[in-house]
């Protein structure tokens, strides 16, 4: 709409149908200011509604709580009774051959693929940020506040991330590993972990 108006006025000016009095007039300046403002408002209102609707998952298949600490993550599967664990980076001296240095953890976050997952994120001490770029997720972890994000994995695989908020001396030693598996594998994993934590 704006481009069409500009081209129309440019054509009128080139054909000399607009006099210098019209071009320099306050009415034209007022139109040049108000019309783009109205167009921007008409674009912004639906965009904001869509932005908020995209962030909400009404009924996720799984809710996961991630708590940032200096310098590890705690995960709680809130849909299960006793399913929680701490996830620390595997030191380079203990890293198995073929694994990524500074990215591998002792306990991965396992999620079922093709299921909407809600992650509730907070921190226990200082600011952190739960970021997994390949899933398009980055959410700040703030002490005393619950932030949420969501994602759906469409294929099995391992997705790596990091704390992306400088949180102290060992900030770069807070990797995040999300493992996406078929639902049956996830159910087997969760029942094994629940059984071992209840011992």
UniProtKB/Swiss-Prot annotation:
Pfam families cross-referenced by the UniProt entry: COX2, COX2_TM
Membrane topology listed for this record: Multi-pass membrane protein
Ranges in a coiled coil: none
MF-aspect GO terms: copper ion binding; cytochrome-c oxidase activity
Positions annotated to bind Cu cation A1: 128, 163, 167, 174
EC code(s) of this entry: 7.1.1.9
Entry binding sites for Cu cation A2: 163, 165, 167, 171
Cellular localisation: Mitochondrion inner membrane
Keywords recorded for this protein, A-Z: Copper, Electron transport, Magnesium, Membrane, Metal-binding, Mitochondrion, Mitochondrion inner membrane, Respiratory chain, Translocase, Transmembrane, Transmembrane helix, Transport
CDD domains, sorted: CcO_II_C
Keyword Translocase among record annotations: yes
GO biological process: ATP synthesis coupled electron transport
Needed cofactors: Cu cation
Residues annotated to bind Mg(2+): 165
GO CC list: mitochondrial inner membrane; respiratory chain complex IV
Signal peptide segment: none
Residue ranges annotated as Mitochondrial matrix topological domain: 14-26
Cofactor note: Binds a dinuclear copper A center per subunit.
Transmembrane segments: 1-13, 27-54
Catalytic activity: 4 Fe(II)-[cytochrome c] + O2 + 8 H(+)(in) = 4 Fe(III)-[cytochrome c] + 2 H2O + 4 H(+)(out)
Subunit annotation: Component of the cytochrome c oxidase (complex IV, CIV), a multisubunit enzyme composed of 14 subunits. The complex is composed of a catalytic core of 3 subunits MT-CO1, MT-CO2 and MT-CO3, encoded in the mitochondrial DNA, and 11 supernumerary subunits COX4I, COX5A, COX5B, COX6A, COX6B, COX6C, COX7A, COX7B, COX7C, COX8 and NDUFA4, which are encoded in the nuclear genome.
Biological role stated in the UniProt entry: Component of the cytochrome c oxidase, the last enzyme in the mitochondrial electron transport chain which drives oxidative phosphorylation. The respiratory chain contains 3 multisubunit complexes succinate dehydrogenase (complex II, CII), ubiquinol-cytochrome c oxidoreductase (cytochrome b-c1 complex, complex III, CIII) and cytochrome c oxidase (complex IV, CIV), that cooperate to transfer electrons derived from NADH and succinate to molecular oxygen, creating an electrochemical gradient over the inner membrane that drives transmembrane transport and the ATP synthase.
PANTHER family: CYTOCHROME C OXIDASE SUBUNIT 2 (PTHR22888:SF9), CYTOCHROME C OXIDASE, SUBUNIT II (PTHR22888)
The name this protein goes by in its record: Cytochrome c oxidase subunit 2
Source organism of the structure: Dromaius novaehollandiae
Name of the gene: MT-CO2
